[in-house]
């Protein structure tokens, strides 16, 4: 049982998502500690009174009741948690780690098992909603973990997200998130093909999307991506091609692991991988439309 109040939250990874969640936690009345591998990032946020900066994983792990990870890959999570001077060596028994990274479920289960041996809890809680959702606490979180760990951190989750779905044990959150992002990739490719065909047929693409959004053909790309980031040319979702390709690749690994035929998903994965020749990793992930529909 974890009976002590969890009032100090350490955020490891202060990029677009991490800094937004740190701000939400601060506004929610929590003591927020922050660490980022990039020099100066935590100190800059400390200067804005968002958090108290820490200079290493070890120091933030020792001082926090809950650790919230917002990192790019499973490899980075493993290094931060299991590596020398990491969370495993320094967090106190009773601490709970919340991993919001979109990560490999097998890696997640390995990390959670190692932490459990030290009496440290783990919940995989990947998020949807982008940097704006992180900054405004309107994200959705899909949670994998024990009922007791999730109950213990529910007050914290409530100040950083608007909706939470507990989908199963450790690893289930990351499995669900990968499938979500795979579908996002499929939707965006399908919508861009429809837009390309409409343009060729003399139909205004914006009118097409307006019509689709009133019918059964609507999807996340027509409802959000095209109106918010593509038609206006902003391409500033805060989510890069590199991250999307990584997520699609991990989702493809899930399909392989369970011998799923999935011809549509596999073709979508092939297109996302092939786009690397002309759309750079650092570009917004919505730039995939330039590969599919080079208008």
Q: Could you describe each region identified by the protein language model?
A:
Residues 2-70, 100, 131:
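NAD(P)+-binding Rossmann beta1-loop-alpha1 motif at the extreme N-terminus of oxidoreductases
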Residues 9, 14, 102-182:
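Rossmann-fold dinucleotide-binding core
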Residues 32, 53, 122-123, 164, ...:
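Hydrophobic beta-strand scaffold residues
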Residues 57-69, 74-119:
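Rossmann-fold NAD(P) dinucleotide-binding segment
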Residues 136-137, 141-144, 165, 169-201, ...:
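Active-site-proximal catalytic alpha-helix in oxidoreductases
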Residues 170, 174, 183, 219, ...:
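Interdomain hinge/lid region at the active-site interface
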């Amino acid at each position: 049982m974890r009976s002590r109040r969890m009032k100090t939250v350490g955020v490891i990874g202060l990029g677009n998502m991490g800094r937004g969640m740190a701000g939400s936690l601060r506004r929610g009345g929590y003591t927020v500690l922050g660490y980022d591998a990039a020099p100066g990032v935590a100190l800059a946020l400390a200067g804005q009174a968002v958090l108290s900066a820490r200079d290493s994983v070890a120091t933030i792990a020792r001082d926090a009741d809950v650790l919230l990870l917002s990192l790019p890959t499973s490899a980075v999570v493993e290094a931060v948690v299991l590596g020398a001077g990491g969370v495993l060596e320094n967090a106190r028994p009773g601490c709970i780690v919340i991993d919001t990274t979109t990560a490999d479920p097998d890696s997640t289960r390995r990390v959670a098992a190692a932490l459990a041996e030290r009496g440290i809890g783990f919940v995989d809680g990947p998020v949807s909603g982008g940097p704006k959702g992180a900054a405004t606490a309107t994200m959705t979180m899909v949670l994998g973990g024990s009922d007791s760990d999730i109950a213990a951190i529910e007050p914290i989750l409530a100040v950083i997200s608007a909706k939470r779905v507990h989908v199963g044990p450790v690893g289930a959150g990351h499995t669900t998130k990968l499938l979500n992002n795979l579908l996002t990739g499929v939707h965006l490719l399908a919508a861009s093909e429809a837009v390309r065909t409409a343009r060729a047929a003399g139909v205004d693409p914006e009118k097409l999307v307006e019509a689709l959004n009133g019918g059964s053909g609507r999807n996340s790309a027509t409802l959000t991506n095209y109106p918010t980031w593509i038609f206006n040319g902003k391409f500033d979702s805060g989510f890069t091609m590199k991250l999307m390709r990584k997520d699609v690749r991990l989702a493809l690994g899930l399909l392989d692991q369970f011998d799923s035929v999935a011809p549509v998903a596999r073709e979508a994965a092939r297109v996302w991988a092939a786009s690397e020749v002309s759309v750079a990793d650092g570009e917004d992930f919505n730039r995939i439309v330039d590969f599919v529909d080079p208008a």
